[in-house]
C-alpha cells in the first residue's frame, strides 16, 4: 500500500511506544468493569456496528473529549479502531496527555468480530 506508506510508518513508530491488548483480553476487562473501551472510529463506522458498552470518541476529537469522559488519568483505557492503526495513534496521544494505563486493541474491530465477540448497532 504505497499510498498509505507515511501513515503506516507513523503507526509503526507509535506501536513502539504503546502496549497492545488482544480482543479477548479487552472483552474480559470491559465485562469486569476494569477498563473503559473507547472506539476511535468515525461515527458512520460506529453506527454500522460497535462493541457493546464501548464509548465513542472519534480519532479527530479524542484529545478534546477524553478529560470530560474519562477524567481519571489512572483509569485503564482500551482504544480500538477498525484495524489497529488509528487506535495506536490515539493510545500514544493519550499517553502523552498523562494517561498511564492506555492500551490499543490489536487488530481493531475486525479482530473483535473475527474472535466472535459480541457487537451492537
Language-model-derived ranges and their functions:
Residues 1-36, 43-77, 85-121:
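Rhodanese-like catalytic fold shared by cysteine-dependent sulfurtransferases
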Amino acid at each position: 500500500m504505497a499510498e498509505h506508506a507515511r501513515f503506516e510508518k507513523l503507526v509503526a513508530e507509535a506501536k513502539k511506544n504503546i502496549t497492545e491488548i488482544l480482543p479477548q483480553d479487552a472483552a474480559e476487562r470491559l465485562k469486569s468493569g476494569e477498563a473503559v473501551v473507547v472506539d476511535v472510529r468515525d461515527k458512520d463506522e460506529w453506527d454500522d456496528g460497535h462493541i457493546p458498552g464501548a464509548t465513542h470518541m472519534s480519532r479527530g476529537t479524542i484529545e478534546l473529549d477524553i478529560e470530560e469522559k474519562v477524567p481519571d488519568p489512572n483509569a485503564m483505557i482500551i482504544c480500538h479502531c477498525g484495524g489497529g492503526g488509528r487506535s495506536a495513534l490515539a493510545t500514544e496521544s493519550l499517553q502523552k496527555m498523562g494517561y498511564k494505563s492506555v492500551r490499543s486493541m490489536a487488530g481493531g474491530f475486525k479482530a473483535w468480530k473475527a474472535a466472535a465477540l459480541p457487537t451492537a448497532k
